[in-house]
């Protein structure tokens, strides 16, 4: 299975009436492994800031998490493993793996 198939079939699928609005798997170096058509174009420094927060949890809290130019307020996650951000009725969740970041963006139902 390709990473694109994983994004399309497993991240963008409906689960109990809920679904992500966009998703991606991005290498820790910022390279795109796979993404949904609606995933925002991000800046390399946005991924660098996310990686820095995984290394030093709390660094994004004062400035917010930016992805595709959109600012999310950082909310409680799991230090070194998951970062969560909130913007209005939606948000973003970033999960760090050994080699990549799995990112899901959602709107509240």
UniProtKB/Swiss-Prot annotation:
It is found in: Cytoplasm, Cytoskeleton. It comes from the Eukaryota. GO terms for molecular function: actin monomer binding. The keyword Disulfide bond applies. Pfam families: Profilin. Keywords: Actin-binding, Allergen, Cytoplasm, Cytoskeleton, Disulfide bond. Its main location: cytoplasm. GO terms for cellular component: cell cortex; cytoskeleton. Binds to actin and affects the structure of the cytoskeleton. At high concentrations, profilin prevents the polymerization of actin, whereas it enhances it at low concentrations. By binding to PIP2, it inhibits the formation of IP3 and DG. Belongs to the profilin family. Multimer. Occurs in many kinds of cells as a complex with monomeric actin in a 1:1 ratio. This is Profilin.
């Amino acid at each position: 299975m390709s990473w694109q198939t994983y994004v399309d079939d497993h991240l963008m699928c409906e689960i109990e009436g809920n679904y992500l609005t966009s998703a991606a798997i991005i290498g820790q170096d910022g390279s795109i492994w796979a993404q949904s058509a609606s995933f925002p174009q991000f800046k390399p420094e946005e991924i660098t800031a996310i990686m820095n927060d995984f290394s030093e949890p709390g660094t994004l809290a004062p400035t917010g998490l930016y992805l595709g130019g959109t600012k999310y307020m950082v909310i409680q996650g799991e230090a070194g493993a998951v970062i969560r951000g909130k913007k209005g009725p939606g948000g973003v969740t970033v999960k760090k793996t050994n080699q990549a970041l799995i990112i899901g963006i959602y709107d509240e139902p």
